[in-house]
């Protein structure tokens, strides 16, 4: 079977965006990365793509290799009309809960764009309150809209880079090995080395895990 080109992969996503643009004009795609892990920020990105300078290969970032995501990240940053990346830290997640923290991050990302869009497309099934323009949720939006897919890549790569730096600073937690999810190894390392400020304490409590004296 012939392997599809990047242009062929992205064609349906750009066709979707063209239909949206024909109705609303300028619009932004928004997505997040890192809602589920035990530590680190949730990262949110908003992106307005330039239809005259497409970025081929865009798709749901989870379906792309790390090498491909990195290459797309650089191209999106170069070609996008506007983009904004926001990190929402564990302190905000613990205070507001992960859903509200993510919604707040989405609002910040949209408000931080250099261009004000007429519409915002949000990956998922809900939209943040308080936006000054219409917003629509798009289930599996990162595999439906090129703009949401681009935001997905920006968010995923930004968070991955952040977590790789944490892994270098705190090698004893082996963050790269367990991908910061609630694995047996991860809990054992937390019990041994304690809870650092980058951990989401509300997530540890929800999992019924709270090391005594740590």
Residue ranges, per PLM feature:
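RNase H-like, Mg2+-dependent phosphodiesterase core
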Residues: 1-214
């Amino acid at each position: 079977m012939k392997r599809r080109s990047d242009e062929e992969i992205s064609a349906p996503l750009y066709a979707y965006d063209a239909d949206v643009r024909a109705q609303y004009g300028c619009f932004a795609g928004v997505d997040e990365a890192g809602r589920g892990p035990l530590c680190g920020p949730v990262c949110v990105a908003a992106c307005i793509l330039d239809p005259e300078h497409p970025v081929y290969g865009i798709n749901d970032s989870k379906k792309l290799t790390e090498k491909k995501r990195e290459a797309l990240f650089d191209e999106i940053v170069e070609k996008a009309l506007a983009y904004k990346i926001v990190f929402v830290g564990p302190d905000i997640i613990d205070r507001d809960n992960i859903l509200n923290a993510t919604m707040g991050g989405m609002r910040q990302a949209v408000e931080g764009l250099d261009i004000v869009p007429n519409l915002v497309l949000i990956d998922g099934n809900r939209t943040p309150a308080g936006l000054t323009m219409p917003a629509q949720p798009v289930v599996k939006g990162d595999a439906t809209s090129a703009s949401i897919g681009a935001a997905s890549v920006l968010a995923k790569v930004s968070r991955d880079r952040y977590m790789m730096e944490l892994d270098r600073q705190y090698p004893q937690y082996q963050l790269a090995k367990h991908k910061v999810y609630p694995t047996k190894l991860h809990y054992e390392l937390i019990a041994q080395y304690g809870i650092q400020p980058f951990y989401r304490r509300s997530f540890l409590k929800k999992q019924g895990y709270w090391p005594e004296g740590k």
